[in-house]
Amino acid sequence: MRRALLALSIPLATTALAQTPLPSHGPAKGYLVITGGVPDYKNFLALAGGKDAHIVVIPTAAITGPGEKRLPPYCSAPGPFAGLKCTVLHTIDRKVADSLKFVAPLRDATGVYLEGGRHWRLADAYLGTLTLKGIFALLDRGGVVMGGSAGATIQGSFMVRGSSDPDDNTIMMAPGHLVGFGLFTNATIDQHVDARGRENDLAPVMKAHPELLGIGLDESTSITVHGDTLTCNGPRRAAIWDGKDHYGKGYYYLRAGDTLNTATRVATLVSHPPDP
């Protein structure tokens, strides 16, 4: 049975770093579903309107070159959005991404799915364009954006693992590719943490930028961000890097049902069985 919630800064005995962390904010009206790699279609589609959803898929991060044509059947069987109103948008041409014709499907969309791959491709194609403005407008209407892996990291304001030349995602801070979409402000997001042994990879980023809220997602974990509330949906963990020392680590874990006020950095935890 779910026990009483405990509201506290975890842990109580922490040491703040010299620079005070800044508040982080998600969309005031809309929602972000951010996953460590495995898509959370259930929560995404529920927030997008269920059978009445209009989904826009942006697969750009996964497309390796102009000749790439082998895309999954997102909008048709057996794809995840079969039977729904669904549109695929892709370009690497910034002029196209900044055109009214290209962004037209976003005007009445209720959900955007950002495919995984290399998030620098998303940044290069869409930062500063009408496409990104259309995504923000969708959130202002109460819509939802979901992304895992690259589609997770791009949602933050500070982009890690963004190196394009060389194309090396072990480089945590790549000059020229540090700016994400900023759907989640003053935040940086890492992914595939448990599957790829990335538990401490955010440490140098947080040392250089202690004002940020850092989030490290296990591969099967999703979080939902709405306003100043981050909810961990599970089933695994979300590591929260909040600029404090937590018994020798720079982070602590949220699990399914736990929430975080991203403005105050106060976590609200539920009772969980011990890890096996």
Can you say where each PLM-predicted feature lies in the sequence?
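Bacterial N-terminal signal peptides
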Residues: 4-15
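A general structural motif
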Residues: 29, 50-53, 109, 142
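C-terminal and late-domain segments of enzyme folds
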Residues: 19-51, 62-69, 76-81, 159-276
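A short, aliphatic-rich alpha-helical micro-motif
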Residues: 106-107, 139
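Class I SAM-dependent methyltransferase SAM-binding "motif I" and its flanking Rossmann-like core
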Residues: 115, 121-196
